[in-house]
């Protein structure tokens, strides 16, 4: 029942005690860095790497997020690249060399314009920090609606390309970053919150991105949950039978509807 209660976002009960299993802190990973001329090239490399290895990190940044971070850090990121990949390898010794060679081979096969291994901790951390700075960097450009859609890995390129097309169609900037190794993306819908027309278009973009994720066989939430903003898409995500079953479970465990009312149903 653990997954049922955790996934219910507080609508079935309140967690009062949690037992954690701790694992040793890993040593810093080697990080392979690559810039790509197209989204398709970058996501093709993600699929290739993930089919050969189990990297510790596979992070993606699109052109909007690259440029936002470069505006903030001036660290020399390639402003003309359509995508940046960071692939982490926590193997050591000979195994690390073999894995990194396979990662770089995938980069080359998929047309990376620049690639290298940040094998010292300081350089690796600078690129990981750049990825972590993507959200605050984009928040400097305007108000942000953060999405959390995911798809099966082979559809990742279709999703990211489609996200960009949706933004362009509505005249709204969308910067996408992703935990690309599992197909989980965070499109950031950037808009002027003082402009009612932009607010309306941003909401349309938000909804169409979720429609696209569902159409591609994915999910409206890879990490952040349904909450209140995504309720309207929940039945389309689950299908009518699974949605009805969820409502029956809710009714059985919370007949008075007092647990986190209005969330995720």
Describe the predicted segments one by one.
Residues 1-265:
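Noncatalytic alpha-helical scaffold of FAD-dependent oxidoreductases
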